[in-house]
Swiss-Prot record:
A GO molecular-function annotation: 3-phosphoshikimate 1-carboxyvinyltransferase activity
Keyword Lipid biosynthesis: no
PANTHER family per the UniProt record, alphabetical: AROM/DEHYDROQUINATE SYNTHASE (PTHR21090), PENTAFUNCTIONAL AROM POLYPEPTIDE (PTHR21090:SF5)
Assembly behavior: Monomer.
E.C. code: 2.5.1.19
Subcellular location per the Swiss-Prot or TrEMBL entry: Cytoplasm
InterPro entries for this protein: Enolpyruvate_Tfrase_dom, Enolpyruvate_Tfrase_sf, EPSP_synthase, EPSP_synthase_CS, RNA3'P_cycl/enolpyr_Trfase_a/b
Annotated CDD domains: EPSP_synthase
Naturally occurring in which organism (per UniProt): Chloroflexus aurantiacus (strain ATCC 29366 / DSM 635 / J-10-fl)
Name the UniProt record assigns to this protein: 3-phosphoshikimate 1-carboxyvinyltransferase
Amino acid sequence: MKGITLTAPKRLRGVIEVPGDKSISHRSVLFNAIATGSAHITHFLPGADCLSTVACIRALGVTVEQPAERELIVHGVGLGGLREPADVLDCGNSGTTLRLLAGLLAGHPFFSVLTGDASLRSRPQRRIVVPLRAMGAQIDGRDDGDRAPLAIRGNRLRGGHYELSIASAQVKSALLLAALNAEQPLTLTGRIDSRDHTERMLAAMGLEITVTADQITIQPPSEATAPTALSLRVPGDPSSAAFWWVAAAIHPDAELVTPGVCLNPTRIGAIEVLQAMGADLTVMNERLEGSEPVGDVVVRSSSLRGTTIAGTLIPRLIDEIPVLAVAAACASGETVIRDAQELRAKETDRIATVAAGLSAMGAVVEPTADGMVIVGQPGQLQGTTLNSFHDHRLAMAWAIAAMVARGETTILEPAAAAVSYPEFWQTLAMVQEAA
């Protein structure tokens, strides 16, 4: 699918079961691979990134069955059971796969090489390599370890204390996984305020991990505290649901429902921002499923106003910023996004690509070093041709913008959406047909 052309529909209606959460899907496979016993995982996200994790785990000697598209059975091999891979581990386009595996493999006594596609090989890895080396890991890579391929010669690691300088769940998780093969406890301080699925899942698997407001400490597992398999239903991904929340909020005649979405406090920044912008957004039927809070989110047509997105909000909605920028372009007044320099290290430089795309649609957008300023105006977007640059979040953000744009919007390389949302285009058609 080289390109898709969209026009704004008269109405949007539907109940949308969004795909399983991408972060939790990755972790359910990685963590259960080193657990004792077998785990049954349902509502797994069968997107390209998560399937890269499955392929790498299989290459490390773990049996992973897939009885249905969204269902896995992972037969754990225990903490010391991974075996040296016979070939290079290809992480595809998945930064989560590469970074979490780097942490996990750094403490295993064998040689491995992690690589990926051209986009992943261009993304910075020093953020994990430097702290892992401080724990005693032997990791080499291009540009002194800042670019994949990464060659890892695993060995016994040190624990101790490390202060995180950026709020990144991938960095935090890589270090916590490395600590499972460390000789002492590991304590993390600093920017620990990123999504906490790793901490929740490891605790649910029986590991001794203590989390406070300003630090995380994990103890090296003993026989008594070795991880045990954790079966789970993966909740809906709030980063995927956010596309529908914004679509409903900016469209003049819309009501969309996303049931069973993960409402982890570290992931609901987009809900808080949309509510601050005046969105008609209701959270219902809140409950706990496994180690994660979930609920149903209903959004109706709204009159949005500009807001500020910055500070501790950023790590709680970093993946939703492209579509929140679309919401800002359709709101009344100015929206300021700052402290989001992490966007420049994503699949594309999302500050540059989002600003350029919205500007091409007629929005007033000024990119900055760590974000952008958007002067919103309802009804200002004009259809045009936009490139996803193979970035899944861009492809879907442009589709949502097209729902309110005048004229036709053509999106190039729309198949990129399959990385995190394989059914996105079918669902988009459904909510227009149901109207």
